Amino acid sequence: MCKNCLLKYVFLLCAFLTSCALSAQTIIDLGAGGSVRARGANEQDISVSAWRTSADSAEWRDCMVRGFNALSRDSLAEAEKLFQRALTLFPDAASAVVVRHNLGRISMARADYAEAVKVFTEILKVHPERHEVRFDRATCYLEQGNARLARADMDVLMAASPTSLDRKELLFLRAAISMKERLYRAAKADLEEVLRLSPENVSASLLLSIADEKDGRPQEALDRLNVLLQAHPEEVQALVLRADLEAGFGRFEAARVDYDTAIRLAPEQADLYVRRASVLLRCGAKGAARKDLDEAVRRGIPRSALLSLYEEL
């Protein structure tokens, strides 16, 4: 029998039992010397309660399955509604913490970090050992710009060395917190550990080059990007970072080549046209620069934000 048919059957039975009068019904006693006797009112209540619990359990399971399916489709509103219904059915169940955690993650996905922090904090008051929840709260704090509270949660996590979390994820988050606090060497230490654990990790290499540049080491950042692009010549972020550094060194033709490649690989990124237009102006190619600025406007960047560049044409 399919799940939906079973649910319909359970609910029909529950409705029937609820509507029945509490007057005597026939029940078979299967105990020793079994006999036929009348069902009492108390037994009727117990039977109805059992059916209701069964129906609620079936609905709860259905809500959870459909909720996670909705999450996989990025249908946040649908998932939220289903998880909230599951909580209403069994608010004190051991699994309720998982439901609440996912509701908090839905708020995270909506960039409603204040609501997510509220949900995660309520969970951690009762379950301080829930490392995934603490990790998500630290992430929210960082998104809110509160590096101090993010650091406090991260210190707890690093001290616990949780096996439920990937160490690389912890190192990435701590590096991001250090970057926010302008502790660039601390950030680099964590990112270098990520590379020791995962030598081909492109994100760690990119972030290391950014940390080098922020730490006043632009040549080291450029060298790192050169190595990365030898292995990954079509990594758009690396191309853009290298072009930015080359432009900073006054190597505008080299920067232009990298922007050309980046735009070929990711033509939908409007900001790339603005970056290339700035370099084209330095190269004296005003006609090409105008085309790039117009393309950036066509792709959604407000013309008012580009007035200073238009004035250079």
Regions inferred by a protein language model and the residue ranges of each:
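Helix-start (N-cap) detector for alpha-helical repeat units in TPR-like alpha-solenoids
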Residues: 60, 94-97, 131-132, 164-169, ...
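Canonical tetratricopeptide repeat
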Residues: 65, 98-102, 136, 173, ...
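Register position in tetratricopeptide repeats
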Residues: 72-73, 106-109, 143-144, 176, ...
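Alpha-helical segment of the N-proximal tetratricopeptide repeat
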Residues: 59-89, 105, 109, 176
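Structural marker of alpha-solenoid helical repeat scaffolds
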Residues: 89-92, 126, 160-163, 197, ...
